[in-house]
A protein has these predicted regions:
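Generic detector of well-ordered alpha-helical packing
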Residues: 40, 44, 70, 92-93, ...
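Mid-to-C-terminal alpha-helical segments outside catalytic/metal-binding sites
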Residues: 178-179, 186-187, 194-201, 218-239
Length: 239
């Protein structure tokens, strides 16, 4: 994510910073194979709609797939831009407009929602229920970071999604698995149990996924299988 914020040395020269990324960083990153996606934080007092459009269009021309962080703080038009550019996904979206939600649904943009971030910042939760009802594919991520999301708890994420975003447990599981794989263009390889896909499984200590939202702050994982190999058994990492 080359354009999360303007570095101090570029402050007040945001357009020049965008140019620097397009002219210098994109070719270098592409040549070294360091990234598959290009991302930008389209938000008030960060990067404008036009700056974001220019950055993302240039990224696509240089072979990158597109992502965008949008409409977290204010309703800014980032969701609409995500739809316009057919981004793979748009993150945050706490303040996404009705028009933005429709634009994402029409363009097949995955709405990646971050309920633990909203919880940590005491912000309004994204409208997950309305997004699903509008035809959006909703995904979830923890957004674990020291500045705005202080938890990696999946049970807490599920509880927030079901209580405050009004998703069913089935919808929350779908969002956290196959839809999250779609957000990184990996749905053909991971995210569900299917013939030919990578063998990634989590077995819980309880008889149903429906227990996930009811055990906030608890580790309910019994077994983790990664690429067909058992890496956690009885809640303990295998050496």
């Amino acid at each position: 994510m080359g354009a999360h914020a303007t570095p101090a040395e570029w402050k007040g020269r945001e357009d020049e910073f965008i140019d620097f990324n397009i002219r210098e960083m994109f070719p270098l990153v592409a040549k070294e194979g360091l990234a598959e996606f290009a991302d930008i934080f389209c938000e008030k007092d960060v990067f404008t709609i036009e700056q974001s459009r220019r950055y993302l269009q240039a990224a696509r021309e240089q072979g990158f797939k597109l992502k965008i962080h949008a409409d977290e703080i204010v309703q800014f038009g980032g969701a609409e831009l995500a739809g316009e550019l057919h981004c793979a996904s748009a993150d945050h979206l706490l303040q996404a407009s009705d028009a933005g939600i429709r634009a994402m649904a029409d363009a097949g943009v995955v709405a990646t929602l971050l309920p633990l971030t909203a919880f940590s910042l005491r912000e309004t939760f994204a409208r997950g229920r309305e997004m699903i009802d509008a035809g959006c594919m909703v995904a979830f991520a923890t957004d674990l970071n020291p500045g705005s999301s202080f938890s990696a708890s999946v049970p807490l994420l599920f509880a927030l999604a079901c209580i405050y975003m009004k998703l069913s447990p089935e919808e929350a599981v779908t969002a956290f698995t196959i839809n999250s794989a779609a957000a990184i263009d990996r749905a053909d390889r991971i995210g569900s149990i299917d013939v030919g896909k990578q063998g990634d499984l989590v077995l819980l200590q309880f008889p149903s996924y429906k227990f996930l939202p009811y055990h906030v702050g608890m580790n309910i994982v019994d077994t983790v299988i990664k690429q067909g190999e058992v890496v956690v058994k009885n809640g303990e990492t295998k050496s």
